[in-house]
Amino acid sequence: AVDIEYDFPFGFKELEGIHSRTDYDLKRHQEFSGKKMLYFDPDIQDSYIPYVVETSVGLDRTFLAVLSYGYTEETLSDGSTRVVLKIPDFLAPIKVAILPLVKKDGMNDYALNIFNDLKKYYLCQYDEKDSIGRRYRRQDAIGTPYCITVDGQTLEDNTVTIRERDSMLQDRIPVDNIRKYLHDKLNVI
């Protein structure tokens, strides 16, 4: 028997067990069922009871390993702590969040239009509660790779800010280019 283990924050735990059962299980099944468990190998022109390798893997611990690996606490220049779930884009439950800077002057309506377009292509979330900084932090903590911010400049020139989760870098792009931008950036299956 061999175990594949992962070093969790609370110590090494098994992710998968691999056991060589040889031909024991099939021989016992053959003995008690009366059914032949033979395999005919055309290359050697002979029949035999094959060996079995039994593997057991749990999705719960595997997923916990992904979350443990991705969970990060960063100290920012202002001394605050940022919790980030740095998981691959294809595992992120939400791919992009659409955030109006404020809930007035038509920014929320503009943002909802973007949300309604993007939700056809990506798992999206619309959020207008709290300050933009708190909304960014919420999205960082759940692993959302990109946040789109609709602000006053958006209403003037039809551009938005797209913020990347891991680096916090921001790009200003035309609204018409959002889908292409996300398609090029997101590593989704």
State where each predicted segment sits.
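NTP/phosphate- and nucleic-acid-binding module
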Residues: 1-189
